Structures are given as C-alpha cells and as structure tokens.
Amino acid sequence: MKTTYVNATIVTMNEQNEVIENGYIIVENDQIIDVKSGEFANDFEVDEVIDMKGKWVLPGLVNTHTHVVMSLLRGIGDDMLLQPWLETRIWPLESQFTPELAVASTELGLLEMVKSGTTSFSDMFNPIGVDQDAIMETVSRSGMRAAVSRTLFSFGTKEDEKKAIEEAEKYVKRYYNESGMLTTMVAPHSPYTCSTELLEECARIAVENQTMVHIHLSETEREVRDIEAKYGKRPVEYAASCGLFKRPTVIAHGVVLNDNERAFLAEHDVRVAHNPNSNLKLGSGIANVKAMLEAGIKVGIATDSVASNNNLDMFEEMRIATLLQKGIHQDATALPVETALTLATKGAAEVIGMKQTGSLEIGKCADFITIDPSNKPHLQPADEVLSHLVYAASGKDISDVIINGKRVVWNGECKTLDEERIIFEASRYKRGLQR
C-alpha cells in the first residue's frame, strides 16, 4: 500500500539537515519511497493521501538506553546517589517483581515513550521475576522498534552465574535479528556487578553470535575508584581486557572518562548512550559530550529509566544535553540544535545499530512523528522549527507516530496499547510492592 502525507514541514535529518516546507512523504508499506517539496502530483499512483495541514514531520526519536521494566518505580528512591539507590531501593524492589507486574510496568513505559515521540529504543531488563518472552511479546505488540537485552549479574553462587550465562546465550540466539523490528544485545550490567569471568563470557557470546554489547560503564567517580582498586585498571581498560570491545559496544553514561579513554573508545567503535537527566539526578556528574564528539565517538541521547529521571521524554533530554555542554564549557556554540537533533535521531540510531531508521530519506524505514504547532503558543512564531524542537517542544506536543509505516499513535491516541487499562493496572500493581 502506498500512502502520501502532504502539506507538511519535513525535518529530514539528511546529510544537509534539510527542512522542507510544504513538502510530502510517500510511504510504500514500511519504507519511504519519496520525500519532496511542492504540490503532490500522484505520479506514484498512491492508495491514500493524508493532509498533514502544516504539521511538522520529523524522524521518530531513538532512545539509546532505558529500562522499561522499571517503569512502576517512578518516584521511588529520589534524591539518592547511585550505589545506595541501587542497593537499598531498586534491587530490593525488583526482587519482588512477578511476570504479570513486569508486563504491566513494561506497558506503562512503552506507552509513555511512544506517545512522546520515541519510535526506537535500546533496553536492559533485570531478569529476576521476569518472563522474558512475555516482555518481548509486549514490546512487539506495541509496534515499536527495539533492542531488548537481558541483563547479567554475578549475584549468588558460581552455579547461579553459570546458569545466567546459559540463559543469556539462549536468549541472544533466539532473539538476535540484525534488521528486524525486535532484536537484542549481550548486556552485562557493569564492571562492579559482574565478575571478570562473566564479562569474558559475555564477550565470547557477542563474538560468536556477532551481536552488539550494552553495558553501564564509567558512570561515577566511585565506580572508577573501586574498579581501579580491585583490578588495577580504570573501567574502560578493564572492560577492554575482558574482550568486551571486540564487538561494537554501547556504554551507558561514560561520565568519568579522560582524553586517552575517549580516543581509545573511538578507535574501538565503542558508542556512548548519554543520559543527562539521570546523571544529574543521581549526582553522578556531567558527561563531556563535546569532547566525545571531537574524539570521534558516536553518541546517542537516552533517558535511562523513570526511576532515575523521572520521565521518558526525549525532547527534555535533547534540551538538557545541549544546555549542559554550553554551561560546562562556557561556550554557547557547544552542541548546537542540529547536533542535538542528530543525537536523538540518526546519530542515536547508528549508536544502537539501527541505521535503517533515524532520518526521512528514500529507502529508510517509515518511522516518523508529527507536531501541530498551530495551537501551541510555545511553538510560535512557527518558522524556527529546529530551534523550537530542541529548546521549546516536549513529548506532550506529539500528534502522530508512524512506525514501520503503521499508525501507532494518531491524533494523540495510541492504537496498539490500551491506555486506560495500562494506567489502571500500573496503580494496582504499584500498590503491591513492599517499600
């Protein structure tokens, strides 16, 4: 089926960051087959023409690091540093999860993401109390594009660790799909929660299955001190010594990196998921994204979980990301709007291995979102589109979300998830958690 979306202002995020006024996009099934300016002449003999009535159309946002299974934990453990937050609040609560609660929590996160303009994401979930197949089915039902990864820890006995490795390898073999809507990565939690043997096994699984790796790394000064004291190496060098960087790797955070480490990461195709709000809220610090980009590191913006953010609004992350770089460098030119948008769209897609999305160009997947500025005073005057998207817009402004050519959100209504039921069940399951 061919559908044309006409009368739109199109933010292409192509190589020229071209913005097309009064343009149209032609979609055939799941692919974009044309993007042009001017009046549509129906040269392609399309089946349906939809008038966007001047809406802004931009690529769907790509969240490079989150934990949607934790969505019921919003507001629990505020105003705490990372380690006590994990050890006294998050992990004890996650130990109470049941398969049904995990699905309800996941649905809430998916609903929030897709209604606020995120179309693709990379996720890590703690497998305790979780039916991994049910989580994957839930994500698939949402219509979103995702890399959903089972997190590995070295908690418990060596036998427990061995079993975790076996389960993770089965999971990777079952769900890894380089070009599909749903895939996975090998996901050791971090250097401070995984043994050397576990990290080495994760590296082996990634190499043998040709998958990517996703890990929390260099998130805090404490992590760097502890790893250096234990292994005689900083986290980057230690992770490399375990073989993790033999495959393209996404490190979440990268807050505490020096110049040599940034150069090393760029050389070894290690990408960074930048979580500005989460890093600020947990008191972890501010990642030097400007220096990362100058070193040649691929960077994508991310939200982390609602437990440490406390929302999944990628527009908010874009804005805080650019403002932080301007502030810490005392340089108003740091991370300009075009770069911020890139780090939330095509740049983010590249970070998590989804090059088929992230821009509105011929041959790309039909993943795009729309905003109607006509009834929004904070987006007026409406002629500075790129500026408004980064500095003024929010996820609440989203009208429509098309993923893989399908209308997942239309006129603000989610078509794939039951919003009323999800919100009701979220409250019901949250009450059952013992705090």
Curated annotation (Swiss-Prot):
Q: What class of enzyme is it?
A: hydrolase
The UniProt record lists the keyword Lipid metabolism: no
Q: Which organism is it from?
A: Bacillus cereus (strain AH187)
Q: Which UniProt keywords apply?
A: Hydrolase, Metal-binding, Zinc
Which reaction is catalysed here?
S-adenosyl-L-homocysteine + H2O + H(+) = S-inosyl-L-homocysteine + NH4(+); S-methyl-5'-thioadenosine + H2O + H(+) = S-methyl-5'-thioinosine + NH4(+)
> What are its cofactors?
Zn(2+)
Q: Which GO terms describe its molecular function?
A: 5'-methylthioadenosine deaminase activity; metal ion binding; S-adenosylhomocysteine deaminase activity
HAMAP family the record matches: MTA_SAH_deamin (MF_01281)
Binding annotation for Zn(2+): 65, 67, 216, 304
Summarize where substrate binds, as residue positions.
Answer: 94, 150, 189, 219, 304
User: Per the UniProt record, which EC number(s) apply here?
Assistant: 3.5.4.28, 3.5.4.31
Coiled-coil regions listed in the entry: none
Q: Which PANTHER family match?
A: AMIDOHYDROLASE-RELATED DOMAIN-CONTAINING PROTEIN, AMINOHYDROLASE SSNA-RELATED
Per the record, the similarity remark reads: Belongs to the metallo-dependent hydrolases superfamily. MTA/SAH deaminase family.
What does the record say about how the cofactor binds? Binds 1 zinc ion per subunit.
- A Pfam family per the record: Amidohydro_1
Specify the protein name: 5-methylthioadenosine/S-adenosylhomocysteine deaminase
Q: Which domain of life is it from?
A: Bacteria
Q: What does this protein do?
A: Catalyzes the deamination of 5-methylthioadenosine and S-adenosyl-L-homocysteine into 5-methylthioinosine and S-inosyl-L-homocysteine, respectively. Is also able to deaminate adenosine.
Membrane-spanning segments: none
